[in-house]
Amino acid sequence: MSSIKIECVLRENYRCGESPVWEEASKCLLFVDIPSKTVCRWDSISNRVQRVGVDAPVSSVALRQSGGYVATIGTKFCALNWEDQSVFILAMVDEDKKNNRFNDGKVDPAGRYFAGTMAEETAPAVLERHQGSLYSLFPDHSVKKYFDQVDISNGLDWSLDHKIFYYIDSLSYTVDAFDYDLPTGQISNRRTVYKMEKDEQIPDGMCIDVEGKLWVACYNGGRVIRLDPETGKRLQTVKLPVDKTTSCCFGGKDYSEMYVTCARDGMSAEGLLRQPDAGNIFKITGLGVKGIAPYSYAG
């Protein structure tokens, strides 16, 4: 077993860092700060951060095959041109729910951009329940709605053979799986593959490794956990020096490093003194397993 090292690589005290995505071409980590309405790009070589401000809470960002990025901003699927910082609306959802916003999102192996919604929080994880839905933006910019009655739409990823879709609705305290039909993007046969332990707290962002195991960031749990979705067993726990771990992705050399985002919103002054790195970006090395490259939106 290699020795695990946890390093704080970016000290910017983001309010709610989320949706980390590694861009291999630029050796950059993309992520968002949701309440600050900011998309960030950290250059791992120069250690510089670039930012683009948008007009509403931005909850996820993803790569785009034709260049630039896509992002979920408010209740809009958007294209983001990094060079001139312009934002172009591709589609809108939940137009009848003025209090909703998107949350986590990710691109599937066929280039569709999946993302779900939730009601705006009055405090972290405090909100009107069952207001959200799960959607995907197809390459032709059409939108498919999969289901509603979602509390906090969160982590998502696909099995290595693309036949299973993994999904987290945070307040269910479970990681769920669906049968996945890649050609059509249809999902079916929902079941639970992992139930959170009490001390693991709230399941948030998620990613998959080359062995098909899932990594879940535990909000208020201060850790990422590695799960076997076939057995429902937890295989590994990596604790971080902050409680509000929000999401994780693999990146860096051969996708052998894990990047973890976290939040500081909702913490007391005393809590912030105790955890000065709250809201920063962490890199974990020595996990002994690699991740896979993120998919890019095909539209």
Curated annotation (Swiss-Prot):
Its EC number is 3.1.1.17. Binds 1 divalent metal cation per subunit. Most active with Zn(2+) and Mn(2+) ions. The physiological cofactor for gluconolactonase activity is most likely Ca(2+) or Mg(2+). Mg(2+), Mn(2+) and Co(2+) are equally efficient for the hydrolysis of diisopropyl phosphorofluoridate. The N-terminus is blocked. Detected in liver (at protein level). Hepatocytes and renal proximal tubular epithelium. Its main location: cytoplasm. Pathway: Cofactor biosynthesis; L-ascorbate biosynthesis via UDP-alpha-D-glucuronate pathway; L-ascorbate from UDP-alpha-D-glucuronate: step 3/4. Optimum pH is 6.4. Its cofactor is Zn(2+); Mn(2+); Ca(2+); Mg(2+). It catalyses: D-glucono-1,5-lactone + H2O = D-gluconate + H(+). One of its GO terms (cellular component) is cytoplasm. Substrate binds at R101, N103, E121. The active site is at D204 (proton donor/acceptor). GO terms for molecular function: calcium ion binding; enzyme regulator activity; gluconolactonase activity; zinc ion binding. It holds the Pfam family SGL. Belongs to the SMP-30/CGR1 family. Gluconolactonase with low activity towards other sugar lactones, including gulonolactone and galactonolactone. Catalyzes a key step in ascorbic acid (vitamin C) biosynthesis. Can also hydrolyze diisopropyl phosphorofluoridate and phenylacetate (in vitro). Calcium-binding protein. Modulates Ca(2+) signaling, and Ca(2+)-dependent cellular processes and enzyme activities. Monomer. This is Regucalcin.
